[in-house]
Amino acid sequence: IENKQAVITAIRVANALHLTIDPLVRFDLKNYFYSDLLKGFQITQQFNPDGKEGYLDIKGKDGQIKRIHIERIHMEEDTCKQLHFADYSLLDYNRAGVPLVEIVSCPDMRNGTEAMRYVEAIRNIVVYSLTSDGKMEEGSLRCDVNVSLRPYGSTEFGTKVELKNLNSLKNIEQALDYEIARQSACLLSGTPVQQETRRFDEASGRTVLMRVKTDAVDYKYFPEPNIAPIQLSEEFVQNAIATCPELYEAKKARYLELGLSETDADIILSDIDMAAYFEKAFAKNGKIAKTIANFLIVEVNGYRNKNGVSMKEFPLPEDTLADIASLQEDGYTHKQCIQIFNDVIENGGSAEEARLRLKIEKQASDDGLVLGFVNEV
């Protein structure tokens, strides 16, 4: 039977990508023989994908908003992890058969930067919808990229080259820019581009030939006979959407309303655990959210980097950081608050207890009072 949570997850991602959701959940068999899936077929959704015809807006290389259209999103089972070496390959079947969501994009991206930002936006959606942790280096989020060039004014695409082994955002940008330059050089010299699969070599910053592709394979799709189709009710679909956690862009808009800069909001949202910590810290007093954000980005991240701890391992409770930020808002200097911050981490207790331990007093800021002290002296 269908995995209910997988269906809910696919609906949430499809909605976030502005796709038209198909209420009919039906699976098909993709038949092929290859070492990545030994049973000889893959369960997928060729004819009834979860969603069709959506889009995602990103910031282009020129800083302007660019819309990337999305053809479809569908569920299918994962294949094994393959590690290729000079004269042998290793196959890890531990993830084979696990459900995944595949997003098929339209050919709207024109350079490595746009592709990188598109994948980054996808990652933000899957992380904040709790679909995946989005760790590309661990394979939780993967992408293959098809690159082809065409003359200016032409409506027909050139020969397609598929790129693999793109396990970071930086690799995506570098691999595409290199491949665009490589194909340009081929075409300008009169050498036709071959239809092939290439991998990105991180050490050299180049793409390397893996295999030459032949004509398209006929996978002979037919309905999966062992999984009955399900017609989802409108209530089920809307409930899946309504119960989706707050997504990256919605959180970012809210943080900007709190007074955070776009840069600070992006830094906090780059780590979902940091965003959760921030939410709890300013829950008592949203007026000091900007001060809390400054402590979080500078002092907390500084401590984490120095001590090699994750956000979940950071020892200071959220409300204590909020209390330290409140002291600064009440007139204590930033330097004094940093002393309190460090003392609480080292000795525990509340912000007020640390202030008393350190015998820190608020510095006088009344000019008349200061002038009176000067006259007395």
Residue map of PLM features:
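Basic, nucleic-acid-interacting segments
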Residues: 1-246, 252, 262, 284-288, ...
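Short, structured loop/turn "capping" segments at alpha-beta junctions
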Residues: 186, 289, 303-307, 332-336, ...
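Strongly charged, low-complexity linkers/loops
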Residues: 311-322, 329, 334-377
